């Protein structure tokens, strides 16, 4: 599996939405994190599971990460897409769906397998896969819509009430 890039980020916290209220949970704000982005070389849930297992072993051996997903030390947010034969011949990819907030390798494997089947079903029924963020419902063993990546209101963007100018 080829690695496209590795970069450092800082966790900013997370938004919690309950009814008509939104809250910001800053418990993880400022926590450094390393993001590893791979090329589209993984073609199945089993390949993803094997890659993550080797990656975690490498990170642990290097002493840079404990690899404990259940403690939030390692996260995986797979981008999954299915393409038609015509798209493959043109060198194109299908529309990607990102699955967020997975807390175990088993959840990664299960969510990828489910999402692949879901997308194939959509395409075979004549529909189009939408670019969205999905979550994983462990109890129902299925992905669930979190938000569309196309609607600004889904990102809770608001107008600032005051702004300062820098000179």
What are these regions (language model features)?
Residues 1-163:
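Basic, nucleic-acid-interacting segments
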